């Protein structure tokens, strides 16, 4: 990207979102985009994958402007997993993931497409959902299915907008670790928006930290995730410690209220129907 700008426009006013963003990302790696709400993270990846057209500047792949690449060819090259699926698919999970093969299809569904779909379902650990109706699944299951669909495209670049937001901590770690592994195994660039700084720091090769519509810092996690940067971008105090060469943040509570453990509590109803009073 070079000198990228984007603004939403109404009849009377322009609302700038991104201003003069220039960054070059190379090779198979996991890149996490961090920053508070409203700084333009989703807009940035939407400009990268041509969902939105920049107001100014250009996005290039291997020297080619994405504007000159057909949508179908671009879909062979780029995959995208949105923040949450609002799509209504009256389809089975298998058929939903099979939609990811569309950019590669010629005349109907081939055995190779079905094989790849099955591999992706097994990779994400949802093969037991293969025959379930997509619309009957939970939010977390939706997210896994959409991730499998994106991977079924076999893209060279994968964009993900908070891919673990509806998952519990076990699957957040597993999915993020898997994305880093896939970047190596499939020679794929993975660009992921995240709000979990510690998970991003643990697994990312590089970090882009955004603030006020621009890139505030970029580079290795240890160089980007510092107490000073966290304070400037998020306006919170944090202590950063190093764990096996990776930064880990600990929030500093400036509330000077003293708490003790001498608090009574009660559970009104338990599974057995009895009332339990705490210590």
Q: Which stretches of residues belong to each language-model region?
A:
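Catalytic Walker B motif of ABC-type/P-loop ATPase nucleotide-binding domains
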Residues: 158-162
């Amino acid at each position: 990207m070079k000198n990228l700008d984007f603004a939403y426009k109404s009849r009377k006013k322009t609302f700038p979102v991104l201003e003069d963003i220039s960054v070059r990302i190379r090779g198979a790696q996991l890149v996490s985009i961090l920053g508070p709400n409203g700084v333009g993270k989703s807009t940035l990846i939407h400009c990268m994958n041509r969902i939105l057209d920049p107001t100014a500047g250009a996005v290039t792949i291997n020297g080619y402007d994405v504007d000159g690449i057909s949508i179908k060819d671009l879909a062979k090259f780029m995959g995208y997993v949105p923040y949450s699926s609002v799509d209504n698919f009256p389809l089975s999970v298998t058929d939903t993931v099979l939609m990811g093969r569309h950019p590669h299809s010629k005349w109907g569904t081939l055995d190779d497409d079905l094989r790849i779909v099955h591999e992706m379902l097994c990779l994400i650990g949802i093969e037991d959902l293969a025959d379930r109706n997509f619309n009957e699944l939970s939010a977390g299951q939706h997210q896994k299915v959409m991730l499998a669909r994106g991977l079924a495209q076999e893209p060279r670049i994968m964009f993900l907008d908070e891919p673990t937001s509806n998952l519990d901590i076990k699957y957040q770690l597993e999915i993020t670790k898997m994305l880093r592994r896939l970047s190596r195994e499939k020679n794929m660039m993975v660009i992921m928006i995240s709000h979990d700084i510690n998970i991003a720091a643990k697994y990312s090769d590089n970090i882009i930290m955004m603030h006020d519509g621009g890139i505030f810092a970029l580079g290795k996690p240890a160089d980007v995730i510092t107490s000073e940067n966290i304070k400037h971008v998020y306006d919170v105090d944090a202590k950063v410690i190093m764990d096996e060469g990776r930064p880990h943040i600990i929030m500093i509570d400036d509330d000077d209220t003293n708490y003790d453990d001498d608090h009574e509590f009660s559970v009104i109803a338990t599974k057995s129907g009895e009332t339990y009073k705490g210590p």
